Curated annotation (Swiss-Prot):
Subunit structure: Component of the biogenesis of lysosome-related organelles complex-1 (BLOC-1).
Superkingdom of source: Eukaryota
Function: Component of the biogenesis of lysosome-related organelles complex-1 (BLOC-1), a complex that is involved in endosomal cargo sorting.
Name the record gives this protein: Biogenesis of lysosome-related organelles complex 1 subunit CNL1
PANTHER family found in the cross-reference section: BIOGENESIS OF LYSOSOME-RELATED ORGANELLES COMPLEX 1 SUBUNIT CNL1
The entry's keywords: Cytoplasm, Transport
Amino acid sequence: MVAEAGASIQAEDVNNDPFRVDQLILDYDYMLYRIKDHVASIHLATTELCRKQNQLVCTGIVEEIIDSNIKNVRELLTKCKELETYFEQLHAIDGIVSTFHERMDEIVKQYRDIKVHTDSASRDHVATK
């Protein structure tokens, strides 16, 4: 009984939102959240590295600390690359959204052309009988 209710709700959701726009909105919001999280993380790590670097300059530089800082900078670069990937995804979404109306207009035009052709063929078929 519960499985049937869940399937009914799921089918109703698909009927109410056949293009799954609600899911796209959730995915988009989550991606923005992840970008903000990455930016905050990079900001904190960069601030900490700068503080440590300033401390090293003031107190003297030790080779181990330099190696540790290089490792931290590499980790930051990895996070920056992940952030770049998210921005590329946003750019791809922008491309899809910007051409959405054009593609929908083309689909409607094709549908009307098919309907006119089908109606014309039906009239010709009826007329020949």
